[in-house]
């Protein structure tokens, strides 16, 4: 079984005469990440990495004599020196887009995030290595009744027979019910696991490495979870993908995380549910959103001054978000 990882986008292959080994960097990053996410995948023997990268300038680059031409779009991804890096002079938005965040999570969201996190935690996988990591959940709440449908893969090489599979499927159901009881006390929760299984035909959710990616599923940035790890259909969201983007000035990444942080701070200060949208304008100062929209629960008025102060504080602290991203401390999916 051979897996292919396609890496697309623009990268800087050199700074002047100093060559940057982008191929090695890509290979190391992909193998490290997939090795962690899919521990049964042999990233040396069964993974082919195909970079499709460019250092082409952005639209609007002005061509001309290279030596005398000042820094601009032409040299954005092919800098002659540090002086060609526009972000050293001014941090600006790379695109016209929007980031959206909200707080707090509702019951269904807490369950979806908590159950998935529990089942895929290192401790859980160490205790139950026969479960895969590609866990998917749909959670619907109707008043105090909560319906959970889960897809929990099992590792074929560690599943000797149908009886073992059935017992572990039941075990997964019990684990989910237990986690749900702790996260949503007072709710009546029903749980279904691997509803597509046909035990008679032995069509089961068995995988070699613990993910449906091995049978043709693909993962594309922007298609799927938001920055908070969820796809909440009745919540405000943008279609911006957070993963795979530059943490320095890509608004699809920074504004999504900043909006989430602002919503969380506003909720903590007021106790009200908040949704925040930050809208950029291409070329505008990154710390100065073009538009800010805030929505709060309840009948009373929203303190506009409080919202402005919180958003200004978050935007002034973008360096903290960048540092957290580079340190791997902020989740992006």
Residue ranges and their predicted role:
Residues 28-184, 191-195:
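Glycine-rich, mobile lid/loop segments that gate access to catalytic sites or pores
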Residues 142-146, 199-203, 285-291:
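A short, glycine/Asx- and small/polar-enriched loop/turn
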């Amino acid at each position: 079984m051979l897996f292919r990882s396609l890496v697309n986008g623009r990268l800087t292959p050199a700074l002047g005469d100093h060559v940057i080994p982008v191929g090695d960097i890509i290979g190391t990053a992909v193998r490290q990440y997939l090795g962690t996410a899919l521990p049964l995948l042999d990233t040396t023997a069964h993974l082919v990495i195909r970079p499709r990268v460019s250092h082409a300038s952005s639209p609007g680059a002005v061509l001309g004599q290279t030596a005398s031409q000042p820094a601009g779009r032409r040299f954005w991804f092919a800098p002659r020196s540090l002086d060609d890096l526009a972000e050293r002079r001014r941090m600006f938005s790379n695109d016209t887009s929007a980031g959206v965040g909200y707080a707090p999570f509702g019951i269904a969201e807490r369950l979806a995030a908590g159950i998935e996190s529990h089942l895929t935690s290192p401790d859980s996988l160490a205790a139950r290595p026969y479960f895969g990591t590609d866990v998917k959940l749909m959670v619907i709440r109707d008043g105090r009744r909560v319906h959970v449908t889960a897809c929990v893969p099992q590792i074929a090489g560690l599943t000797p027979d149908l009886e073992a599979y059935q017992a572990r499927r039941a075990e997964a159901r019990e684990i989910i019910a237990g986690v749900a009881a702790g996260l949503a006390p007072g709710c009546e929760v029903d749980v279904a696991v691997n509803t597509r299984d046909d035990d008679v035909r032995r069509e089961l959710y068995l995988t070699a490495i613990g993910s449906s990616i091995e049978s043709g599923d693909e993962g594309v940035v922007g298609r799927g979870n938001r920055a908070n790890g969820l796809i909440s259909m009745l919540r405000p969201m943008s279609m911006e993908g957070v993963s795979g983007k530059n943490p320095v000035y890509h608004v699809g990444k920074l504004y999504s995380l900043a909006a989430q942080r602002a919503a969380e701070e506003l909720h903590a200060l007021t106790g009200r549910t908040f949704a925040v949208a930050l809208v950029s304008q291409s070329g505008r100062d990154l710390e100065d959103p073009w538009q800010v929209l805030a929505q709060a629960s309840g009948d009373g008025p929203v303190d506009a001054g409080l919202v402005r102060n919180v958003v200004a504080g978050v935007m002034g602290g973008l360096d903290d978000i960048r540092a957290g991203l580079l340190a791997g401390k902020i989740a992006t999916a």
